[in-house]
Amino acid sequence: TFGNTSDFGDLLSTNTAIAGLASNTRGIFQGGSNPNTNVIQFITISSLGNATDFGDALKSCGYSAALSNQVRGVVGGGGPTNAIDYITIAQTGNALDFGDLSNTGEFTITSEMINRVLLHQLVE
């Protein structure tokens, strides 16, 4: 149905091209551009309020791809990195290394299936 918007709260920074993922209880925002940052922040979905610091990503970048289930969040690619990070959504802390993409590039996208994930990059 159509309706009006209302203010939920504010993020810690005003970067663009932030990667987003979620569980049923938390929304996670990682990185961003203008300038590139490695900040990970979160909101609690069930209550209004500003974002809170979650930890740091391994690299500072924007235009990354993000995906998640109820336990883990994975963020990969973006400019200028090929790193893939992961976090445990229920626990705050810094991201851990999940591996690397074969190329460095922005505009990474994801495709999720039941038991596999594909990360695709636009390589110029």
Language-model region placement:
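Polar, enzyme-active/binding microenvironments
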Residues: 1-124
